Amino acid sequence: MVSLPMLARPVCLPVAARLVRKDTVSASRLWLARQMVLMLAEALPGRRIHVVADAAYAGKELRGLPEQVSWTTRLRKDAALYDPAPPRTGRPGRPRQKGRRLPSLAQLARTAAFTPTVVVRYGQKSTVYTATVCCLWYGVFGPQHVTVVLLREAAAGAGYDLALVTTDLQATPARVVERYAARWSVEVSIEDAKQLVGVGEARNRVAAAVERTVPFGLVCQTLAVCWYATAGHDPADVAEHRARAPWYRTKTHPSVADMLGKLRRVLVAARFRCARPEQPTPAELHAIRLAWQDPAA
């Protein structure tokens, strides 16, 4: 997920994919996610990588991640949290790996001190109330310290509305909440890949084609967005779109469909540009007309 200057929301750029075979004995999704994160960390040494996932991506596979990788996910209601391990006593025997067990999340929320926090989620600025607890989620991350962020939408009331956990101990509560909210761009990217790029429409039978077609389509989507961000963007793009559709008055930022449409027009124009002026053929005129009439194609 990256932030682009011409967009008010983060955008997801797929760079890796793995095949999951349903109803078969295969590697778990979490293990595959870990392998992709390790591959990305190896390709980007020295870069900080923040991974955000839903509650399904939490397990013992997350132990031993590189220091440059942080993991943020939703905390389960029945998660067993512990105090950090006490200092060594110097006595013989194995040192303790964890402290006393903490109360449940509901009990922690009753006694926690919630403070107002300004966050930007889904393109809007709002005020929520957060409380943090530094502890261990030993069943998942082992002895690694984590920060639990309890979120409450309203000032009044008891309990909490959302519980997040992160291994990024330097992140503020607002940053953790915003980071988790930005995960929604993954769902938007998958929808764009299916509806605009055509990922998943191929009818493949060969094993290699099944493994490569969808990742190739996702990479093409990423390359198209990168091209638009570096070379294709023009401030007049949105104004041009609103001129074509004057009833669409709320549009203020280009969409992925706009990016793909402009890339298509540029490719068509480059394809039919001649070295010397010549009369275009009816087929060429028809292709250009279709490209301009259907910018989302």
Predicted regions and their residues:
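Short conserved beta-strand segments at catalytic cores or DNA/RNA-binding microdomains
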Residues: 1-9
